[in-house]
Amino acid sequence: QFGFILHHRVMLQQTDDKLAVVMIQETKDRFENLVGSSFDRGFYSPENKSQLAEILDYVVLPKKGRLSVKDKEIEQSEQFVESRRKHSAVESSINALENHGLDRCLDHGLHGFERYVALSVLARNIQILGHLLQQKELKKQKRREAA
């Protein structure tokens, strides 16, 4: 909603489709008001689709490969398309992490890498919070000047 990164994980010999449900369950435990989530095609599996539908009110999980008529209808629905457009913000956050130093880890070992990733996510969230506070203050100033 506000662009914060709510969950991160360093994956070791794991694929996206094996982690989707676990990742959402952990996030839902921390953020009980989470109602929906958007994923890449790599996260799709029939099991993920059904299990995630039980956890969340709305799941955007595009199917891999050729779509059936029913799946095509679902993926062309207005809500699905709108959510997919918003998914670019997720990709943008990942890109921002890379642009602000996560593309090259200066720590050594797995523990150092995990720490580096966690601190990068924290720094990005602080940056987003700062931007939101600046925007709020800017709106206040514009209202004062208009009055």
Region spans (language model):
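Anion-binding and metal-coordination hotspots
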Residues: 1-147
